[in-house]
Amino acid sequence: MKEFYLTVEQIGDSIFERYIDSNGRERTREVEYKPSLFAHCPESQATKYFDIYGKPCTRKLFANMRDASQWIKRMEDIGLEALGMDDFKLAYLSDTYNYEIKYDHTKIRVANFDIEVTSPDGFPEPSQAKHPIDAITHYDSIDDRFYVFDLLNSPYGNVEEWSIEIAAKLQEQGGDEVPSEIIDKIIYMPFDNEKELLMEYLNFWQQKTPVILTGWNVESFDIPYVYNRIKNIFGESTAKRLSPHRKTRVKVIENMYGSREIITLFGISVLDYIDLYKKFSFTNQPSYSLDYISEFELNVGKLKYDGPISKLRESNHQRYISYNIIDVYRVLQIDAKRQFINLSLDMGYYAKIQIQSVFSPIKTWDAIIFNSLKEQNKVIPQGRSHPVQPYPGAFVKEPIPNRYKYVMSFDLTSLYPSIIRQVNISPETIAGTFKVAPLHDYINAIAERPSDVYSCSPNGMMYYKDRDGVVPTEITKVFNQRKEHKGYMLAAQRNGEIIKEALHNPNLSVDEPLDVDYRFDFSDEIKEKIKKLSAKSLNEMLFRAQRTEVAGMTAQINRKLLINSLYGALGNVWFRYYDLRNATAITTFGQMALQWIERKVNEYLNEVCGTEGEAFVLYGDTDSIYVSADKIIDKVGESKFRDTNHWVDFLDKFARERMEPAIDRGFREMCEYMNNKQHLMFMDREAIAGPPLGSKGIGGFWTGKKRYALNVWDMEGTRYAEPKLKIMGLETQKSSTPKAVQKALKECIRRMLQEGEESLQEYFKEFEKEFRQLNYISIASVSSANNIAKYDVGGFPGPKCPFHIRGILTYNRAIKGNIDAPQVVEGEKVYVLPLREGNPFGDKCIAWPSGTEITDLIKDDVLHWMDYTVLLEKTFIKPLEGFTSAAKLDYEKKASLFDMFDF
């Protein structure tokens, strides 16, 4: 195997690297790195180096990084550009690993850890770390073991040893239900005092130093607490042993929620799983507590316990340690499902960056472009700061609030990256500007063609067509790589299905799995051989196929995320290739493209349906259009369709054979009009939506921009046996809406779209009765605890105090002086409940930390004084009124004089 790096740090004038050698062993090296930088030189000077604009450059090799940094400063002082990679860690990685890195994740030591701290005076502040650490669970990926460090004797009480036998038992047998699959992997170590525990943990840490350090919220709590606690007891030099290079950095980050201390352990990449989840899950959750996310992802939360966590060690030490172990296990389970660690590794090694830099699209793309240009002897420009300036965003069409029975949507593939490639937008391809006409003149093709020579965007920018831009070239590479890896993924998936089929009737003759490449479809010969394999061999092959599928999926998702993140980087003033003109060219072209195709689709469908001036495109947003197909169905005649599948088949065929070619012709005309480098605006049919044939359902409705619901039967060619709801921007999708109300509103929408008004009215009556019987947490609304201090006037709400902040202040007064009650933390989510007049809390509402039960101290009073009427009106009826008003339906049956008679 070839070497690959694990971590790389610049400390002083040296590069410190942890890496895996060719024998698969972890090594460390200190390198006195000699970086290269570049300066422009005369045209007459012989050189093989050129900047991205084609200007000749001369290479300067420095004795060390300090000299290189000083040269950059001297160049800046005299107003000259110092070109090349000034992040010497990235430059070192590029020089050392000038090949595609094939990493082995089994060699990368990933630690997942969690600490417990008993604090008698509220939340244990990590920057102070004044209370003992009384439990640590540390999972090591290479050992596949859970190492548990348990403090038996503490200032807050002495406890008996934890029992693995009790932990494994069912709860009704007095056990903790620690899963059997991890029981044998637990190594339990009790300690009589904290000094012994911490020193043993530090020794263990140095023997098994993590490459990747993860856990839930470890960057904000566990890491700084462990570091500061060791520092408090043994001194700073001992705490620095947590870094394999004995180098740490303490940084205080200030934001609107207050301050927090971040400890950087040089030589270890921290991938806090809460941050990975927020970045890569693409979900908006009402709470990011581990308990809530575990329930959401795994359908099982943290280990439950009675009373406050501050009393758990003393009251039930057995449960306390099991709780600590399960916290670590839940993070492992979430990653086993989501694969965010592997995704980060794949992205990091592809870009050749420190693995923790995957959180930054700027750092990631800077490295990708640098490495690509370096292969061509092209020199990157110097990074410069730019003023923050606004520029246009995406186009969103204002819909007419209404019901829409039959709808088709069409979606542009990777709009912004495709615009960059089509127009050839890059810093070095700018050719000049042209006189700009109003945007609607370009949309309607009545403005003069901007240029016969250059590729244009309607913001007035012109780009060369005779050269490939750096940015479009890199996007194209990643596009092609994604296509390749997606092909591998799908082939492995198909091969897995063939193996599964053979497992239904395994043979006993051959007990040796075939040596095949799962990235490509099995040949007929291999398929025949598979039929002769034993179940053991087939299961081994299925495992390999599934592993290949996961590898392909991770690689293609990585490329997809990279593609989509580049536009964000290009619009960031800190990006090396930022140019406001280019950012504006991308978004303005996108605005034109969507409205251009709206015009073309309307023209085409008016022609098909024999109508004039009809607006068939009812909505558009950024890269998608939504087309009303009512008149298309009417032209054929709804009665002609046998069943729902029949009309879905018809619209599918109409979209594929008629509309997609018409759309493609329209975009080709636009490409010609703008004289672009190549045609890359590809728009495919996405959703086909409508009610079941013969039902009273309405099919779909819009209430406003980015707020709609559709009953979808087919999505991108995948036909559903049962329709799926596509809901965007409505209260069902908002984390502030109570969970039970989300579910009820979704059922209301389903009935509106599939069954009609009468069914909706029946359900409304049912839920109105059921509401008061629901668990209080499931009907509490959710808000963020922002700017508490701004509205806090001596513990009471100040002028213009928001409703949920008023509730937080009510809660704080109610629990004042009680350290066992969960504290509301600035910036975190809270549950909110309205209260009836005359309540003992003296205010309209109360709010407490989300993801938790309200403290027993005040629970009975809160439940007694809950205002169900206000809660139902605010969270359920008001949103429902918005849906039904737009859809021209009534959620309650209106009284009529005719109801008094039997006829």
Model-identified regions with their sequence ranges:
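DnaQ-like (DEDDh/DEDDy) 3′-5′ exonuclease domain used for proofreading
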Residues: 1-209, 323-326, 330-346, 359-396, ...
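Glycine- and acidic
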Residues: 182-188, 208-212, 313-319, 396-405, ...
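Common nucleic-acid-contacting/processivity interface regions adjacent to the catalytic cores
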Residues: 308-428, 432-434, 503-512, 518-520, ...
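Catalytic palm subdomain of template-directed nucleic-acid polymerases
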Residues: 625-659
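Acidic, Mg2+-coordinating catalytic module of metal-dependent nucleases/exonucleases
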Residues: 207-222, 226, 268-362
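C-terminal, non-catalytic extensions of nucleic-acid polymerases
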Residues: 652, 656-903
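Conserved DEDDh/DEDDy metal-dependent 3′-5′ exonuclease domain
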Residues: 149, 155-285, 323
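Intrinsically disordered, low-complexity acidic Ser/Thr-rich regulatory segments
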Residues: 175-191, 261-263, 451-469, 512-558, ...
